[in-house]
Amino acid sequence: MVNYTLSGTALKAVFLHSDALYLSIISLLLVSFAIFFCFFSIMMTVYFTISHLQEVPRYIFFAHLLINDTIYITLGLVSFFSSAYLIYFPMPISYMIVTISSSAFKVSPYNLAVMSLERYLAICFPLRHSGWCTRQKTILTIVAVWIIGLLPNVVDFIILCFSVQSDYFSVYCLSVRSVFIKNDAQETLRFVVHSLGFSLVGLIIVFTYIKIMLVAIKLNSGKATASKAGKTVMLHAFQLLLCMMSFSYNLIEIYLRKYLYMLPMINFYFFMCLPRFISPLIYGLRDEVFFRYMKRIMLCKTPRTFPNSDST
């Protein structure tokens, strides 16, 4: 997880300069989270109410993406307020929070990669798609994605255990990643994993987009479907770019922190939370099926039978 520790000295400076500005940003953060959680709840209601959606691979992946982002944002808020208000947790709980949130951070781009591959199979191999992309295989893919996301944290934990005293896990600490960095190998591991992971995901998205658009150019029939799938993959690329914005957090804070005392908090909102707040908007509201049933739920209407649609 990207380090966003707000020191006690910086926090005091915030209050001395402007309590109103500080409270405004906190309020904006909480209101944004409330709106995001509202959309999340409506979309999950649609997903679990319409049984057919639970059999379609891309909707399963999308539901998983929403759940994963919600986990990440929630634990990120816990870590942020732990740092800002100096709230201490038992070491094992703090480490668990950091581990799950950092794994969720890695899982988001991996999920975008498999969503792009699913669209690639649907357009380029339509006859085999139903056999390759079953509900069971989709669930197994999600499990595999989480295993890949957790493996670096397992290695990190082993390195940590060899780098600290035996009583290290018996104390209370802030729930931030910097507390658990005790060896340069941990930072090296994190850099390598993020670099390779995001590069591979980027290559997969570019590859699937090119393949899908080539099909759209060659086909006279079904061109609209392939074009829609290409636009969907481009949305995944945009979501990946939003995820990568998190890496600019440390660079901006290093060079600009001395000029803006509110920078840690502003950085946390715009580069850690906001990209995931808008995820339901750039994908969920664009999907015709989700939009139709979300509107029915918000208007308190009973959903009708799900149409056999393959909108992207």
Regions found by a protein language model. Give the residues of each.
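Intracellular signaling interfaces of 7-transmembrane GPCRs
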Residues: M44, T49-P57, C124-I139, V206-V233, ...
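Intracellular effector-coupling site of seven-transmembrane GPCRs
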Residues: Y172-I181, L214-F247
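Fourth transmembrane helix
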Residues: V107-N111, H129, C133-F169
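Loop architecture of class A 7-transmembrane GPCRs
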Residues: V2-A13, N153-G197
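Seventh transmembrane helix
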Residues: M245-T312
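Extracellular loop architecture of rhodopsin-family
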Residues: A13-H17, S82-I97, F180-A185, Y249-F277
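Structural signature of the GPCR N-terminal helical module
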Residues: V2-Y4, A20-I100, P109-L117, A144, ...
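Hydrophobic alpha-helical segments of membrane proteins
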Residues: T74-V78, L151-V154, I158, S195, ...
